[in-house]
């Protein structure tokens, strides 16, 4: 694994981003392989039910796929960007659950 500098993704991150930005599904597989544990770590305390976590993680994957073009290295690391997406989406999911609304 490459050591990452502050605000500068390592080679693996660049490769993952490049694949995602070209629409290569293998990029998402690589991203989830490398950062899936981080995403689960962020989501778990917010969504204690496994079913809710799995639903949310699917939504997170879709959001990453749709918005990968908005990631810029000068604003932070890939891990920080993914953490922000996961946290915000988990909070939104929890709010919907609390209100009794389910996303269809």
Residue ranges, per PLM feature:
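Short acidic-aromatic loop segments in the C-terminal HATPase_c
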Residues: 65
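Structural recognition of an alpha-helix C-terminal capping motif at a helix-to-coil junction
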Residues: 41, 55-62, 76-88
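Acidic, Ser/Thr- and Pro/Gly-rich low-complexity regulatory segments
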Residues: 10-16
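Charged catalytic carboxylate motif
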Residues: 12, 38, 81
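Arg/Lys-rich amphipathic alpha helix in sigma70-family domain 2
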Residues: 69-70, 84-104
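Short, charged helix-capping/linker segments at alpha-helix termini
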Residues: 2-7, 21-30, 40-59, 70
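Hydrophobic/aromatic residues within well-ordered alpha-helical segments
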Residues: 31-35, 39, 86
């Amino acid at each position: 694994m490459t050591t990452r500098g502050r605000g500068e993704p390592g080679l693996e991150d660049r490769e993952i981003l490049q694949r995602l930005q070209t629409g290569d599904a293998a990029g998402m597989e690589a991203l989830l392989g490398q950062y899936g544990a981080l995403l689960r770590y962020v989501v778990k305390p917010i969504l204690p039910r496994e079913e809710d976590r799995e639903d949310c993680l699917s939504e997170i994957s879709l959001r990453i796929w749709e918005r990968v073009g908005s990631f810029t290295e000068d604003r932070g690391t890939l891990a920080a960007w993914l953490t922000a997406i996961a946290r915000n989406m988990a909070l939104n999911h929890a709010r919907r659950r609390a209100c009794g609304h389910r996303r269809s």
